[in-house]
From Swiss-Prot:
GO terms for molecular function: chemoattractant activity; growth factor activity; identical protein binding; protein-containing complex binding; signaling receptor binding. Residues 38-124 form the PAN domain. The single-chain precursor undergoes proteolytic processing by TMPRSS13 resulting in an active two-chain form. The single-chain precursor undergoes proteolytic processing by HGFAC resulting in an active two-chain form. This is Hepatocyte growth factor. Residues 129-207, 212-289, 306-384, 392-470 form the Kringle domain. InterPro entries: Hepatocyte_GF, HGF/MST1, Kringle, Kringle-like, Kringle_CS, Kringle_sf, Pan_app, Peptidase_S1_PA. Residues 496-724 form the Peptidase S1 domain. It holds the Pfam family PAN_1. The keyword Transport does not apply. The modification Pyrrolidone carboxylic acid is found at Q33. Belongs to the peptidase S1 family. Plasminogen subfamily. It comes from Rattus norvegicus.
Amino acid sequence: MMWGTKLLPVLLLQHVLLHLLLLPVTIPYAEGQKKRRNTLHEFKKSAKTTLTKEDPLVKIKTKKVNSADECANRCIRNKGFPFTCKAFVFDKSRKRCYWYPFNSMSSGVKKGFGHEFDLYENKDYIRNCIIGKGGSYKGTVSITKSGIKCQPWNSMIPHEHSFLPSSYRGKDLQENYCRNPRGEEGGPWCFTSNPEVRYEVCDIPQCSEVECMTCNGESYRGPMDHTESGKTCQRWDQQTPHRHKFLPERYPDKGFDDNYCRNPDGKPRPWCYTLDPDTPWEYCAIKMCAHSAVNETDVPMETTECIKGQGEGYRGTTNTIWNGIPCQRWDSQYPHKHDITPENFKCKDLRENYCRNPDGAESPWCFTTDPNIRVGYCSQIPKCDVSSGQDCYRGNGKNYMGNLSKTRSGLTCSMWDKNMEDLHRHIFWEPDASKLTKNYCRNPDDDAHGPWCYTGNPLVPWDYCPISRCEGDTTPTIVNLDHPVISCAKTKQLRVVNGIPTQTTVGWMVSLKYRNKHICGGSLIKESWVLTARQCFPARNKDLKDYEAWLGIHDVHERGEEKRKQILNISQLVYGPEGSDLVLLKLARPAILDNFVSTIDLPSYGCTIPEKTTCSIYGWGYTGLINADGLLRVAHLYIMGNEKCSQHHQGKVTLNESELCAGAEKIGSGPCEGDYGGPLICEQHKMRMVLGVIVPGRGCAIPNRPGIFVRVAYYAKWIHKVILTYKL
């Protein structure tokens, strides 16, 4: 698969600032060894950004490197550069770095866009405030506190001095800018142009004075990147030295830019993880704004008689929990001590002992006056009527009680009371009929993938509803593969079909062809069902008449396989849950199971496979040869845990429940285009199962880069549910 790249201009088209888009980057650090400088934390990142500076005299430096970390290290050291490095651009596709003596604030610089480029600017050159004594300040203020113009550092007029740029390398004694080369008290200063005043400090504010927040800082999006004790913050897109769940791509609305202080979890004020291995996190010193101007989109709608969403805007006077126990006053520490006080949560209306939701919990709550019951929810407060556009669900949505009544494909839901017989057919308990109101989307069978409903369309008996998880409610990360909880194999016996033991051949392997050309692989999991990847059928309303499933073949070019092959049309396509990258294909007629065509077993729902288990992938995809022979090939991989997988991906990957990681035993082996949809087959207790599905990843069989597969065990219940209910 080829990836497009944009070439940098040979001479003087440079790059910078369009918008912030964090991508994970790994910073090397070894505990127990001398701590290495986390230089990437000293740069502000602007993704897909370029700059243009049309000046033939400007020099730049370029070199092939392995990562943005290397670029940052070279820029900070400034070794071998004929200029002071203020910024760099990293070309992700070509692994090349471009170092610049200018940044986005320099004169004559124009902004641009470059898909493959990320710009990093040294924060010291773009800050308009100082941290601590201001020893790192490299801004352009050149006037003293009393308004006197500064004397250039390389000049001896009107004042002779020893602070020459050549004597203080690295202190950026450029032009006549205010500096603090010795890190003295008082902050940046300069010699003045007034013969009567030798030197004077400059009026540059502390960053803690410039930055301000409203309420408890949940909407703060400023560039404060140090804690109140002066520790540098860890980047949100990194897991070193502290592992955490607040990944920018998982919480796109939390403002996780670079390593800036944020408050994503309802703490009293903004905070950050630190670069100190012994200090996981600390609060940041950000003052309250004098005028509490709050972005209206960040303020929950206030209600007094009912709650909207999670009830963060509830301002009513209910003061007991659901069972009638009175609430404890928020300004009291008896009988329960706590830090959720009116002082710490100024904008949360913590008056008296009224039920509130100051920390983003499921609903309004309070500490109770019962010493044996610390907190309780005020679930007796009714929910306000909400439109479907505001709907969301928590967990798997089994408690969702909204009024949406359409599927994700736009079909109108049918009444639950007309479908109770079908519902009883695939669940083994009596559903709560009180929740199955009218034709609203619900989750009576505890489906792991959210609310759904029956439809009046016989070809689509049921489907999921277009409801998202509530903000902050995300798919948890995968369990540790070193400690499997559920065995994936359902039996220790080999499967037998029609009295014939399943062959050691790969009879379950399917070649999906479009107009007689192989496009994807697939797995025959039932006589009438094939499991494959969604990417093989990108258009939801695609005409299936041009698609065929070829079974029982080894040579995708059909040579010498007339007797064993079965060619079946596809009658139906069922898309998997949102984000699953899976589809199930219903065959026009069942496959005939014989010595050349067989089914592959599915794993138990939610099971895990031990790390280092050897598995295999199969496919007819790209092999690196111009004239591929079209033969089915196999590559052996081993299951890899989350931590090790993340290391191989330079910290850019954190597996969740729906993903599985496997690395090649042979360098350069792995799935490529044409293999997508094919299976990752593992064996447990002498039973082979399809544990993963190949989907497009981060390149094709890249050395030391394990593949990320769809974890079939996470979707096993959905697969069984579809097979059971899609009868036509």
